[in-house]
Amino acid sequence: MNRIIFCTFFKKKSEGQDFQSYPGKLGKKIYDQISKKAWEKWIEKQTILINEENLNMFNLEHRKKIEKYMKLFLFKK
């Protein structure tokens, strides 16, 4: 059975993610408030950002930058 949540990205009830895809408290918030479709949109945007800004996910500063972008993308609409 699909998990239905109120997606804060789309501002409507939507199918939730199957599992917590990001660690920690932020991951829990994403799992509880961001739909599967919204998370897919973020993954697409993340890929674009990594490529455009030539980010290296082994670099801690670059990972922090992506996390900042993720928070803005998912929660500041």
From Swiss-Prot:
It holds the Pfam family Iron_traffic. The lineage of its organism: Bacteria, Pseudomonadati, Pseudomonadota, Gammaproteobacteria, Enterobacterales. PANTHER family: FE(2+)-TRAFFICKING PROTEIN-RELATED (PTHR36965:SF1). The keyword Iron applies. Gene3D superfamilies: Fe(II) trafficking protein YggX. GO terms for cellular component: cytosol. Could be a mediator in iron transactions between iron acquisition and iron-requiring processes, such as synthesis and/or repair of Fe-S clusters in biosynthetic enzymes. GO terms for molecular function: iron ion binding. InterPro entries: Fe_traffick_prot_YggX (IPR007457), Fe_traffick_prot_YggX_sf (IPR036766). Monomer. Keywords: Iron. SUPFAM superfamilies: YggX-like (SSF111148). Belongs to the Fe(2+)-trafficking protein family. This is Probable Fe(2+)-trafficking protein. The keyword Iron applies. GO terms for biological process: cellular response to oxidative stress. HAMAP family: Fe_traffic_YggX (MF_00686).
